[in-house]
């Protein structure tokens, strides 16, 4: 049995195949996922697993150098926005790097997901609970 933190074989595989600057999306239950992008559906029911639970597990194994959010999260979901920023701040301290955070419109965000290696769908049912994580290097 795998000893690492990610037991889901699809997520583990995607993370292990990421190269520098490749992207991985963690999203809420409502984000449309392009047919051209691999979908890893973790949603069991509303809120399970939560967006932050999925982000937490993914970032335990993924080296992150940047994150892209929809600008709308600031106004429409400020509590989750703050929670995510705090998590990313703690992650950069743990990794010993600076994680660049940028924002784009939700419409542009949806277009960017088409270039990601995969989209991991959580059971989150709150607005704009989506992030594009950009892979860094560990050296």
Curated annotation (Swiss-Prot):
Organism: Salmonella paratyphi B (strain ATCC BAA-1250 / SPB7)
One of the protein's GO biological processes: D-ribose catabolic process
Organism superkingdom: Bacteria
Signal peptide coordinates: none
Gene3D superfamilies cross-referenced by the UniProt entry: RbsD-like domain
Record's keyword annotation contains Nuclease: no
UniProt-listed HAMAP family: D_rib_pyranase
E.C. designation(s): 5.4.99.62
Any Pfam family hit: RbsD_FucU
Keywords: Carbohydrate metabolism, Cytoplasm, Isomerase
InterPro entries reported for this sequence: D-ribose_pyranase, RbsD-like_sf, RbsD_FucU
Gene Ontology cellular component annotations, sorted alphabetically: cytosol
Protein name: D-ribose pyranase
């Amino acid at each position: 049995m795998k000893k690492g933190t990610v037991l889901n074989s699809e997520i583990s595989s995607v993370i292990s195949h990421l190269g520098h600057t490749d992207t991985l999306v963690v999203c809420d239950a409502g984000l449309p996922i392009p047919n051209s992008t691999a979908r890893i559906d973790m949603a069991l029911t509303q809120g399970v697993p939560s967006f932050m639970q999925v982000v937490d597990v993914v970032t335990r194994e993924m080296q992150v150098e940047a994150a892209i959010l929809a600008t709308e999260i600031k106004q429409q979901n400020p509590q989750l926005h703050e929670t995510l920023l705090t998590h990313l701040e703690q992650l950069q301290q743990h990794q010993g790097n600076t994680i660049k955070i940028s924002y784009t419109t939700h419409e542009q965000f949806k277009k960017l997901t088409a270039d990601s290696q995969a989209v991991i769908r959580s059971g989150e049912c709150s607005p704009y609970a989506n992030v594009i994580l950009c892979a860094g290097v560990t050296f």
